[in-house]
């Protein structure tokens, strides 16, 4: 009568194999960061960035304290943000686009303000005063000198401009993702553009693998990637359960630290 042996994988070896509950199936896509973003979170995030959006109005108020231009621009900014939030809730992409363009304009303004602030730090105050005296009638340089004087008067202006630029960039990214999700849902939900999880251990290990020494998950994944891909019409490769029973007739088992041999 033939002798049969039951080979059970070692628990220490089997602990390296991720379970099916912990690892997604092959081909399952991971949702993007902004695909599952709740509309309420977008509303709260955009509302919290209103102070950063209003920095340009504060700068204009410091330069022109008696003008109605800062107040008008603040109202316009608030209206566009509110319109974008209503568009996100009602899923109307045309209501988000004006706010997105407005954010890009504000980003350019803050970058311009940051460059002037850095230039003002490099020029001493005496040089600025001499420039005012030597060029009193040149109108093209007047606005530039006003911004430089403002940057020299408020030393924290460059740091505030950098912080508000980062906030505006994040807000513009959120608005663009919301607009893209509403306007082009097929592009956002395209599985080819999403990251896919690696295949499970069972899909990598072939049925003809050596029963004496099961490979690790990294080795099985490497061997599976080196195999030629099958055609789309062909069925998926047969998978083997994590705890398979193998029968080897009339074979004496070799000593192995990876396997536990039970004689029947």
Curated annotation (Swiss-Prot):
**Protein's membrane topology:** Multi-pass membrane protein
Keywords for the protein's UniProt record, in alphabetical order: Membrane, Transmembrane, Transmembrane helix
Question: Which superkingdom?
Answer: Eukaryota
Please give the chief subcellular localization of this protein.
membrane
Q: Where in the cell is it found?
A: Membrane
**Residue stretches spanning the membrane:** 43-63, 68-88, 96-116, 150-170
Q: Where is the secretion signal located?
A: none
* Chain residue ranges for the region called Disordered: 216-247
- Tell me a GO cellular component: membrane
* Biased amino acid composition, Low complexity: 224-237
Q: What is this protein called?
A: Uncharacterized protein F59B10.4
Task: State the organism named in the record.
Answer: Caenorhabditis elegans
